[in-house]
Swiss-Prot record:
Name the UniProt record assigns to this protein: SPX domain-containing protein 1
One cellular component term from this protein's GO annotations in UniProt: nucleus
InterPro entries reported in the protein's UniProt record: SPX_dom (IPR004331), SPX_prot (IPR031142)
Purpose: Involved in plant adaptation to phosphate (Pi) starvation. Inhibits PHR2 DNA-binding activity via a Pi-dependent protein interaction. Suppresses the regulation on expression of PT2 by PHR2 and accumulation of shoot Pi. Optimizes growth under phosphate-limited conditions through a negative feedback loop of the PSI (phosphate starvation-induced) signaling pathway. Regulates the expression of SPX2, SPX3 and SPX5. May be an important link between signal transduction pathways related to phosphate starvation and cold stress.
Expression by tissue: Predominantly expressed in roots and leaves. Localized in leaves lamina joints.
Induction: Up-regulated under phosphate (Pi) starvation in lamina joint cells. Up-regulated during cold stress. Under negative feedback regulation by PHO2. Up-regulated by the transcription factor PHR2.
Lineage, opening ranks: Eukaryota, Viridiplantae, Streptophyta, Embryophyta, Tracheophyta
Note, other: SPX1 and SPX2 have redundant functions in repressing the activity of PHR2.
Signal peptide start-end: none
Chain ranges passing through the membrane: none
Cellular location(s): Nucleus
């Protein structure tokens, strides 16, 4: 699948409020078509060398550009600003949310409140899914920049991809160490909560067959407060934006960062211990049905 179609598919799968935060790949391709072919490459390089001798490399690159090329680069810079603003805002939000969830877990455990623990656990899984989406956001936008710059170099005869990507590697949206740490802390909270405090959902009093505890495949036959969970709740859960988006994001991350016969200096490293799509689905399935219905 071509990258443009893959990106569009990922944008559809992600959270609605995120959709305008991704790389404007179509707009960049339209701008690229306005740029003439790569003729005059030798003249371009000669002009760049003359300006570089008098000034800096950036001034030389700008001087060698046509107005259309300069417009393309301005759009690229605006895209970087967009990525960074959104990514930093989300990271700051996640730091606060992580602390709040840790405090809620501690309070609920102290009061031995199973209902509160269930609600918090559901929120933690949603939170984990959203952070995985942000990891995917970073990887997708980086990959899109690499691909559009390759097209630019091919069309214009310029060689800006390497210096521009070196600049990208220093941008906040690409620096995911803190995000990775938050994801791992979130997984540690889930590891702490999931093995214990499990509620059976096969009977009113919570004492059911243990073999059914991790099988939310038939919520309509389970009992909550003496009644069955409507099928609507099952549908709403299965269509959860977090679940669908997160599993799709993990598949995309695995594809983008997997080994390839065309590995280059621009390739992202393979995933390091992140959950697979199957593991993320399994994580969601571990949430008892009584929690799935509690939005």
């Amino acid at each position: 699948m071509k990258f443009g179609k893959s990106l569009s598919s990922q944008i559809v799968e992600t959270l609605p409020e995120w959709r305008d935060k991704f790389l404007s790949y179509k707009d960049l391709k339209k701008r690229l078509k306005l740029i003439g072919g790569g003729g005059g490459g030798e003249e371009r390089q000669a002009k760049r060398a003359r300006v570089a001798a008098d000034g800096g490399e950036e001034e030389a690159a700008a001087a060698a550009m046509t107005p259309e090329e300069a417009g393309f680069m301005r759009l690229l810079e605006a895209e970087l600003d967009k990525f960074n603003s959104f990514f930093v805002e989300k990271e700051e939000e996640y730091i606060i949310r992580q602390k709040e969830l840790q405090d809620r877990v501690a309070r609920a455990a102290g009061r031995e409140s199973k209902e509160e623990l269930m609600r918090v656990r559901k929120e933690i899984v949603d939170f984990h899914g959203e952070m995985v989406l942000l990891e995917n956001y970073s990887a997708l936008n980086y990959t899109g920049l690499v691909k559009i710059l390759k097209k630019y170099d091919k069309r214009t005869g310029a060689l800006i991809r390497l210096p521009f990507i070196q600049k990208v590697l220093q941008q906040p949206f690409f620096t995911t160490d803190l995000l990775y740490k938050l994801v791992k802390q979130c997984e540690a909270m889930l590891d702490q909560l999931l093995p214990s405090n499990e509620l059976s959902v096969s009977s009113e009093d919570g004492r059911g067959d243990s073999t059914n505890e991790d099988k939310p495949s038939n919520p309509s036959s389970s009992l909550v407060n003496g009644g069955t969970i409507p099928e609507l709740d099952e549908i709403e859960y299965m269509e959860s934006m977090y679940m669908k988006g997160t599993v799709a994001a993990l598949r995309s991350l695995k594809e983008i960062r997997s080994g390839s016969s065309t590995v280059s200096a621009f390739s992202l490293p393979p995933l390091q211990g992140d959950s697979s799509p199957e593991e993320q689905q399994e994580l969601w399935n571990k949430i008892p049905v009584i929690e799935q219905a509690a939005k």
